[in-house]
């Protein structure tokens, strides 16, 4: 009787209305009906070590990153009387435009280096209270395809290109995973308002 009611209650199969399981279903069928109801597909993620090998940091870039970090530390500790200025777009969606911006900013930064420590804001991820585009790393094509490996490559390549100009970069870290792919190219990392109380970040 119950099995008949279950069969009769079946409606059209949609993402919001997954198929009901028969009481006689086996473990594999039950698991398939319950697991990953909101997952459309799974793709392997490139490892941080492989991406770093594919897009390495050279000596000049490493020097820019180290100098950017040490200068920021000196300013925050009061050993350098310059101001830190983090300037750049809200979030990068066009690497070519961001690199053009970086060229222009590097010229200005060179002219004020005695008064200001200029760091380019290069944010790739968008913290979201609700829904919306989550940034270049998560959805580089802005079409919902979520080509994360492509996004990670684009992000790391852009950070290397900007640092090669002698301009240090700053990024917001929304989770402890992304820094494994790009942290060696970043001079200044931020924790945003939405993640300020994140237990994962505290750990």
Swiss-Prot record:
**Could you tell me which InterPro entries the record lists for this protein?**
Aldolase_TIM, DAHP1/KDSA, DAHP_synth_1
Q: Which Gene3D superfamilies match?
A: Aldolase class I
- Provide a Gene Ontology MF annotation, just one: 3-deoxy-7-phosphoheptulonate synthase activity
Q: Which GO terms describe its biological process?
A: amino acid biosynthetic process; aromatic amino acid family biosynthetic process; chorismate biosynthetic process
What residue spans carry the region label Disordered? 1-28
Catalysed reaction, written as an equation: D-erythrose 4-phosphate + phosphoenolpyruvate + H2O = 7-phospho-2-dehydro-3-deoxy-D-arabino-heptonate + phosphate
Q: Extract the Pfam families matched here.
A: DAHP_synth_1
Instruction: Name the job this protein performs.
Output: Stereospecific condensation of phosphoenolpyruvate (PEP) and D-erythrose-4-phosphate (E4P) giving rise to 3-deoxy-D-arabino-heptulosonate-7-phosphate (DAHP).
Put simply, this protein is called Phospho-2-dehydro-3-deoxyheptonate aldolase
